[in-house]
Curated annotation (Swiss-Prot):
PANTHER family: GLUCOSE-1-PHOSPHATE THYMIDYLYLTRANSFERASE, GLUCOSE-1-PHOSPHATE THYMIDYLYLTRANSFERASE 1. It comes from Escherichia coli (strain K12). The gene is rfbA. Optimum pH is 8.0-8.5. Active from pH 6.0 to 10.0. One of its GO terms (biological process) is protein homotetramerization. Both catalyzed reactions, i.e. dTDP-glucose biosynthesis and pyrophosphorolysis, follow a sequential ordered bi-bi catalytic mechanism. This is Glucose-1-phosphate thymidylyltransferase 1. Catalyzes the formation of dTDP-glucose, from dTTP and glucose 1-phosphate, as well as its pyrophosphorolysis. Keywords: Lipopolysaccharide biosynthesis, Magnesium, Metal-binding, Nucleotidyltransferase, Transferase.
Length: 293
């Protein structure tokens, strides 16, 4: 099986969240008890991906480096690249060409939160796919805000549209994508859309036309949260808080995922818990080390 690398696109100007994001990246804002970027990072980790590129703006990249470092504390290899201006999601593959090399890759948007017991299993099928692309569809009330996938009566994807005025279904394409290495050349060959961007929907449409696009359904039991508005930030925080307080288990905790997947050992978890020990997060990590003995 080929190696698969991960990209987190954490750029953009976050204008819909002004004035909150006038001085700080949206992806550094808190979602309950952790920075937003921990959630997409955890998604890639749950897929078993350890080589990850974070793409952000010139002003925000140093802040992500300060927060996340080189990733070695979690058994990861984190690298960074700058996106000078937000010219479309597909630009991530051009910026990340050297990082991707000859490998397959996954892209997750830095403001997307995924939750579900079977999420690792769902992603495993995408990771193990030898060629082509996999995207994930989720039923929404407001499909006109997203890329929309249309299915025939057999459940086969037949069309993709970006933010259509009259959506052909209620299934939105989420901000998590798995591609083979062909995606790099496809991105380089793309023409900007009417709004001047290199559209991820155009990449997905090429794979669809070639008969190489798989659409995996995130059905009942999954949550996909898009945190682009003030209201959705509150809703996402409340969602995470409700689950964590009810179960006593953390959602998207990189330290825990790294430990459970064998990226780091119990001693490293203990070391990571020390500077956080005055709050619930650090105490949770410390308790985890005691329980594992």
């Amino acid at each position: 099986m080929k190696m698969r690398k991960g990209i987190i696109l954490a750029g953009g100007s976050g204008t819909r969240l002004y004035p909150v994001t006038m001085a700080v990246s949206k992806q550094l804002l808190p979602i309950y008890d952790k920075p937003m970027i921990y959630y997409p990072l955890s998604t890639l980790m749950l897929a078993g991906i350890r080589d990850i590129l974070i793409i952000s703006t010139p002003q925000d990249t140093p802040r992500f480096q300060q927060l996340l470092g080189d990733g070695s504390q979690w058994g990861l290899n984190l690298q960074y690249k700058v996106q000078p201006s937000p010219d479309g999601l597909a630009q991530a593959f051009i910026i990340g060409e050297e990082f991707i090399g000859g490998d397959d890759c996954a892209l997750v948007l830095g403001d997307n939160i995924f939750y579900g017991h079977d999420l690792p299993k769902l992603m495993e099928a995408a990771v193990n796919k030898e060629s082509g692309a996999t995207v994930f569809a989720y039923h929404v009330n407001d499909p006109e805000r997203y890329g929309v996938v249309e299915f025939d009566k057999n459940g086969t994807a037949i069309s993709l549209e970006e933010k259509p005025l009259e959506p052909k279904s209620n299934y939105a394409v989420t901000g998590l994508y798995f591609y083979d290495n062909d995606v790099v050349q496809m991105a380089k060959n793309l023409k900007p859309s009417a709004r001047g961007e290199l559209e991820i929907t155009d990449i997905n449409r090429i794979y669809l036309e070639q008969g190489r696009l798989s659409v995996a359904m995130m059905g009942r039991g999954y949550a996909w949260l898009d945190t682009g508005t003030h209201q959705s930030l509150i809703e996402a925080s409340n969602f995470i808080a409700t689950i964590e307080e009810r179960q006593g288990l953390k959602v998207s905790c990189p330290e825990e995922i790294a430990f459970r997947k064998g990226f780091i050992d119990v001693e490293q978890v203990r070391k990571l818990a020390v500077p956080l020990i005055k709050n619930n997060y650090g105490q949770y990590l410390y308790k985890m080390t005691k329980d594992s003995n």
